[in-house]
């Protein structure tokens, strides 16, 4: 799993390794989910992320977490 936050773009993303995105689904206009051809979750993107969670102490972040 890879988690990134871009403070300037106000975008938070979570990507699951081994799952290739085939389609992006607009959930709320600011939240998008990416799925593969079989409907498995490939990633989640949150725009305007600081309006949805307290991210004031975060700067640009990139974290990889093995599953």
Regions found by a protein language model. Give the residues of each.
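Structured beta-strand/loop patches that form or line metal/cofactor-binding pockets in enzymes
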Residues: 2-7, 12-26
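A general secondary-structure signal for short beta-strands and their flanking turns/coil
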Residues: 9, 28, 58-60
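C-terminal structural segments of small proteins and small subunits
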Residues: 38-67
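Amphipathic, hydrophobic secondary-structure cores in small proteins
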Residues: 17-38, 44
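Proteins with a high burden of low-complexity, intrinsically disordered sequence enriched in S/T/G/P/A and R
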Residues: 3-6, 10, 32, 40, ...
């Amino acid at each position: 799993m890879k988690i990134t936050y871009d403070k300037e773009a106000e975008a938070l993303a979570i990507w699951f390794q081994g799952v290739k995105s085939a389609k992006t689904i607009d959930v709320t206009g600011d939240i998008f989910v990416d799925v593969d051809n079989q409907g498995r979750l490939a990633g989640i993107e949150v725009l305007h992320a600081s309006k949805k969670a307290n991210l004031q102490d975060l700067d640009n972040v990139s974290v990889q977490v093995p599953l």
